[in-house]
């Protein structure tokens, strides 16, 4: 009997059509997925049920009816008896859109619904032993107030106890969050905060009182420790725009600053200088001495305490020795426009020093006139060139240009009638003393930005050499024009600024230059052509710094193949080099304790005078000449 019943049931199951719910596709829009399962006739033996995800955010929680049987204890034996009750509960019509549901509850319910679908898909294929043939009945119920509003329902009778309990928990959680009314409470709290917040107003900065805002010292408050105000400081004198005004034009009286003008000693001094108006008749163009005899004479030159003189108050910028054979007279030009004269034969030695003030700025160049040794010509930065005449006791003005600053000059003619003057701005002036007035005959500009020294060739006096920033140029005075004069030759071997450039005193066959690159250079100027070759470069420290006068290497007028230059070496010394670069002699001693930047040698006698930056002169001479 049982076999026949089983066979009949098996045949009946083959003929009866089976139902299968459409599978959920992930690319469908969840918000518009219908809860009504589509009916599909499948000729298979088993039926599979898939749950489509749904959202409770569009429905009101008070109208959502969950099955009460989920709260009871479920088991596999109770599925059949409670099937009808679950159907009726889940087939109710759910009203549309639930309002005022928090976003947090929505996301929780959506995630839970999606999880149910995923877990059911995983569990149902594996439980083949417990699979049941479920008949899915789809019913439509209509609301009395609407004609077409229908809501699909699902049959949850085939769910496991775990799934039904899980749906119950989801529903209870949704009810709980809805009962809290979090969104409404948040809205009310937000309104309360906005109402309580006072209006924002810009804070006004308090005005500072006129009193002292910060702590200050008694020195700044100008009070003493007892609190008494200190007396007001005296008003400093107003500085004049030009601290060194130019001296008035015209001749200046020769007035000594350190000696009385009316005493007999000063008159005797002027008479002594005026008596030297005749130039020396001794031939200075005799042949050169041998180096051996020259060294012997240099070794006999000594310095003593009696031959150190304090002449001026400022640094010495220029120096000249009078060519007298009987008296030793030294002239110096100082920084503050002073011209000092020193007679070494006068005793005591303080009585032989006379200081005059013919200029207002540094005296950079000083020469005794070759035609009249009683005349001394001085040139200054203040743009004046004066001639001191001791026979008349005046400083006569030779050339004046208040718009320019002079740097150096030399005599173009042997009778000292014409002069060439170099300017700091690179211009050159040709001055004729025979022309009335204090102006120039010709003014020309050079290709140099600055001129420091000017020196005339001793034989071919139409040529003169200038030293400037980087180059040394040789010009022809006959070719100077009013616009810009081009040099005949340029010595371009120098790498830094040049302090001086001088022809050799007798023949002019050599040129010595002093450069800031710590080199002395000697050139062969025996043939003034397109190029003058470099003969010798002597390494010598010429870095004097800011407070010392720059070195200027000069030829010995008696021995034109030897150069005299100051030295920065210790102990202090004055050195003489041969044109080949060999050191010939070094002057020194216990009374030479400073750097002698400016040096001059007597044209015929073995007398050397060196000036330092404190206004002192140091004289080396033979004991016979003392």
Swiss-Prot record:
It holds the Pfam family WD40. The keyword Amino-acid biosynthesis does not apply. It comes from the Eukaryota. Residues 140-150 have a biased composition (Acidic residues). WD repeats lie at residues 311-352, 358-400, 402-441, 446-485, 493-533, 535-565, 590-626. GO terms for molecular function: DNA binding; enzyme binding. Residues 99-123 have a biased composition (Polar residues). Interacts with CUL4A and/or CUL4B. This is WD repeat-containing protein 76.
